[in-house]
């Protein structure tokens, strides 16, 4: 990032989906940065330039006049901050595609909530492999794209290797209606974002199956315990789960029908079993199988996550999974 605080940082958001567009809009609206939204498709960039909107991703929302649009990797030249806002499973390919265009001094921030399915890598780990030498951060927490883009009050977390970098990122990306809290727990912040998607699917299953609000409350509370164990086992801070990137994001995603993960779970609950449709569209479907596999390798128990993974994979139906969860040995909370 720029060493001169009087110079507005250059920010490039890679990925013109709903969340990337929203982040670019809120950063541009703050008037404290030079912001470009980089789409991998020229027709999307051209539509945004021509109409001042991204109707494919955020219909009906006008974008700030100062926001730039591009489909060329050259837009990354001189960027101080690069936000990777594409889905988690596309991060490695994007890093390989754009890596040579990103300057050595740029700080790279992943804004996706997942893990790489094939390796179980956290996205910061993946980016560090593909883009060595860069400072790598993560932005996560409870924020729907439409809310952010509409200027509704939203608070999230940005984590980086040290607090100075995290604070710089928070100051550069925050605006009047968008507040970022700095953190150094990249592991905890990432896993909170990834695992809450799995638990949102579980809560959706409960809702779709008509199992009641008490069951949802149990899933949220016991799910937080699973998240805490997993974060600690992966080297993060267990207490991070109590903050915005853990509890905050879980409550939002597990209770709002804006959540794709919740809606996917509701469909599973209504059907009673997986039907092979929709799993490729939700981050939680990838995270469930990865987290269950890694938990086994780490020797930690994650029964809710394992049940969700088994339901999505078609190995269990909802009723059998519920019976197995409810018949587990009684232990102290």
Swiss-Prot record:
GO terms for cellular component: cytosol. Keywords: Cytoplasm, Lipid biosynthesis, Lipid metabolism, NAD, NADP, Nucleotide-binding, Oxidoreductase, Phospholipid biosynthesis, Phospholipid metabolism. Its EC number is 1.1.1.94. It catalyses: sn-glycerol 3-phosphate + NAD(+) = dihydroxyacetone phosphate + NADH + H(+); sn-glycerol 3-phosphate + NADP(+) = dihydroxyacetone phosphate + NADPH + H(+). InterPro entries: 6-PGluconate_DH-like_C_sf, 6PGD_dom2, G3P_DH_NAD-dep, G3P_DH_NAD-dep_C, G3P_DH_NAD-dep_N, NAD(P)-bd_dom_sf. The active site is at 196 (proton acceptor). GO terms for biological process: carbohydrate metabolic process; glycerol-3-phosphate biosynthetic process; glycerol-3-phosphate catabolic process; glycerophospholipid metabolic process; phospholipid biosynthetic process. It is an enzyme of class 1 (oxidoreductase). Coiled coil: none annotated. Pathway: Membrane lipid metabolism; glycerophospholipid metabolism. Sn-glycerol 3-phosphate binds at residues 113, 141, 196, 249, 259-261. NADPH binds at residues 19, 40-41, 113, 145, 260, 282-283. One of its GO terms (molecular function) is NAD binding. Gene3D superfamilies: N-(1-d-carboxylethyl)-l-norvaline Dehydrogenase, domain 2, NAD(P)-binding Rossmann-like Domain. PROSITE patterns: NAD_G3PDH (PS00957). It is found in: Cytoplasm. Belongs to the NAD-dependent glycerol-3-phosphate dehydrogenase family. Catalyzes the reduction of the glycolytic intermediate dihydroxyacetone phosphate (DHAP) to sn-glycerol 3-phosphate (G3P), the key precursor for phospholipid synthesis. This is Glycerol-3-phosphate dehydrogenase [NAD(P)+]. It comes from Sinorhizobium fredii (strain NBRC 101917 / NGR234).
């Amino acid at each position: 990032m720029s060493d001169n605080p009087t110079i507005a940082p250059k920010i490039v958001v890679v990925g013109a989906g709903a969340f990337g567009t929203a982040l670019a809009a809120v950063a541009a609206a703050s008037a404290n940065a030079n912001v470009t939204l980089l789409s991998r498709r020229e027709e999307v960039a051209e539509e945004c330039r021509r109409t001042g909107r991204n109707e494919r991703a955020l219909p009906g929302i006008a974008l700030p006049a100062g926001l730039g649009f591009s489909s060329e990797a050259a837009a990354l030249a001189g960027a101080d901050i690069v936000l990777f806002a594409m889905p988690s499973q596309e991060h490695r390919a994007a890093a390989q595609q754009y890596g040579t265009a990103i300057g050595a001094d740029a700080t790279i921030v992943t804004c996706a909530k997942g893990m790489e399915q094939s390796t179980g890598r956290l996205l910061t780990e993946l980016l560090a492999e593909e883009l060595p030498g860069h400072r790598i951060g993560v932005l996560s927490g409870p924020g729907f794209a439409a809310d952010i883009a509409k200027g509704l009050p939203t608070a999230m977390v940005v984590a980086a290797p040290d607090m100075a970098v995290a604070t710089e990122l928070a100051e550069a990306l925050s605006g009047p209606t968008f507040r970022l809290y700095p953190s150094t727990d990249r592991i905890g912040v990432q896993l909170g974002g990834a695992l809450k998607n799995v638990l949102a699917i579980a809560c959706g299953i409960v809702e779709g199956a008509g199992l009641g609000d008490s069951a949802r409350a149990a899933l949220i509370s016991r799910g937080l315990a699973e998240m805490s164990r997993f974060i600690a086992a992966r080297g993060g801070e267990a207490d991070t789960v109590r903050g915005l990137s853990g509890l905050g994001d879980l409550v939002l995603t597990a209770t709002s029908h804006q959540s794709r993960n919740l809606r996917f779970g509701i469909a599973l609950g209504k059907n009673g079993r997986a039907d092979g449709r929709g799993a490729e569209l939700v981050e939680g479907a990838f995270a469930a199988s990865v987290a269950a596999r890694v938990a086994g390798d780490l020797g930690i128990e994650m029964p809710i996550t394992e049940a969700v993974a088994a339901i999505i994979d078609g190995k269990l139906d909802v009723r059998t999974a519920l019976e197995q969860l409810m018949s587990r040995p009684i232990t102290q909370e």
